[in-house]
């Protein structure tokens, strides 16, 4: 079983990230698709959620494990909420329908030309962010997914999520 605490405690910060730009006490783990299984990386983080997952998604499809993990989290009593881009619903692999069926609250960000954020804030302490789309085809792309364990970073992303929520439909 994956535990966020140990890998984050052991995580090292890439030399490409200036130390001054990292919140004190933050631990960072990174994943690069094609070379690594970023869907499994995200699923492990979601599986550790106990209270809340705030999701911002440009693309969201079934089949990668992410939607399925969010449905399971909701089933465990985790408060899962989603803000999606207006173009997210798509035929056949639509991730919105199973989430809605599970009782996940969903809003559409129709104000922005494109709601291109791809983030999750988990339990006000862990933030997933990067270019990685929550879609089945992302594994074939060159994308990145970063997991930051920091209450301060999570608070900033949660505040932005709530700002976007204020303008959704």
Question: Regions from the language model: what does each represent?
Answer:
Residues 59-63, 86-90, 112-115, 126-127, ...:
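Solvent-exposed loop/turn segments at secondary-structure junctions
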Residues 24, 47-48, 99-100, 112-115, ...:
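Extracellular/periplasmic catalytic domains that process cell-envelope and extracellular macromolecules
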Residues 2-40, 88-91, 139-142, 160-169:
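Short, small/polar-rich loop/turn modules that mediate ligand/substrate recognition or access, typified
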Residues 37-40, 67-68, 114:
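Alpha-helical scaffolding within the catalytic cores
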């Amino acid at each position: 079983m994956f535990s966020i605490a140990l890998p984050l405690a052991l995580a090292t910060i890439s030399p490409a990230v200036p130390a001054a730009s990292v919140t004190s006490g933050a631990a960072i783990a990174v994943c690069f698709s094609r070379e690594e299984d970023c869907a499994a990386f995200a699923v492990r983080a979601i599986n550790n959620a106990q209270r809340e997952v705030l999701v911002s998604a440009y693309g969201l499809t079934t089949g990668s494990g992410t939607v399925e993990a969010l449905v399971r989290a909701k089933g465990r009593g985790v408060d899962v909420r989603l803000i999606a881009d207006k173009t997210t619903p798509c035929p056949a692999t639509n991730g919105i329908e199973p989430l809605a069926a599970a009782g996940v609250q969903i809003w559409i960000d129709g104000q922005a030309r494109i709601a291109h954020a791809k983030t999750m804030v988990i339990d006000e302490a862990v933030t997933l962010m990067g270019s990685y789309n929550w879609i089945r085809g992302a594994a074939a792309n060159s994308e990145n997914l970063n997991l930051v364990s920091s209450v301060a970073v999570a608070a900033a992303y949660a505040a932005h999520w709530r700002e976007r929520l204020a303008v959704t439909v």
